[in-house]
Amino acid sequence: MSGLPESKLGTKQYWDNVYEREVSNFTEFNDEGEVWFGEEAEERIVQWLEDHISTSFREVSEAAPFRVLDLGTGNGHLLFRLLEEEDTLLPSPCQLVGVDYSEAAIVLAKNIARHRQFSDKVKFQQLDIIKDSKFCSKDWDLILDKGTFDAISLSGELLDGRPLNSVYVDRVRGMLSPNGIFLITSCNWTIQELEERFTKNGFIVHSTVPVPVFEFQGSTGSSTSVIAFQIDPSFNRK
């Protein structure tokens, strides 16, 4: 699985600039900003939750709420979408957290949460999971990624000589609970490429999400790939 060409979309400065503009737009026009990959991608995630929420996750309690982490949350739209149907989509009690390495993104998400009166139901925090291990404890039941692995894959940075997308895979594995699920949506990698990358690094495939397929010059493909992984229980013994 080769890397992607380096791009400005893989830099923190690019996303800081994007979200600083969106903060201004929200303040002036109540414009919540772009829905990354479109609302159709979010509806596929909602459908996946409807199909799997009752069979794939543990029992929850007040002492041990269901924990959802959205990596690269941006304007927080995905978590807001889940909250719109929280009674049917999510176990109760539930803790929703969105993190992003752009402080401007977190400002925007918090502003939107207040506007929608969701501030008491979701938490947003500035965090670079590549460089900060604050959330790297194995207690997240559901980790969501909608475009974050894509953006990281466009970075030319290295950490200890490793591409950041390789470090990212390890970070996610370190945050996921033993029976938790990592659900990733990508527009840059195929299902096969994602499966190859993650199953070589301690994951097994839980399920895939059907997406529209197009055909061009005899080849078939899709605009996005959506796949769910769990931790391979035998990984540390290999």
UniProtKB/Swiss-Prot annotation:
Which domain of life does the protein's organism represent? Eukaryota
What EC number(s) has UniProt assigned to this enzyme?
Answer: 2.1.1.-
Write the signal peptide boundaries: none
Any one Gene Ontology BP term: methylation
List locations, semicolon-separated.
Cytoplasm; Nucleus
Family matches, as Pfam families? Methyltransf_31 (PF13847)
| Coiled coil feature spans | none
Question: Can you name a GO cellular component term?
Answer: cytosol
Tell me the GO molecular function terms. Answer: protein-lysine N-methyltransferase activity
Q: Which InterPro entries match?
A: Efm4/METTL10, Methyltranfer_dom, SAM-dependent_MTases_sf
- Print the keywords alphabetically: Cytoplasm, Methyltransferase, Nucleus, S-adenosyl-L-methionine, Transferase, Transport
Name where it mostly resides.
cytoplasm
State the family it belongs to.
Belongs to the class I-like SAM-binding methyltransferase superfamily. EFM4 family.
Protein task = S-adenosyl-L-methionine-dependent protein-lysine N-methyltransferase that mono- and dimethylates elongation factor 1-alpha at 'Lys-316'. May play a role in intracellular transport.
Q: What is this protein called?
A: Protein-lysine N-methyltransferase efm4
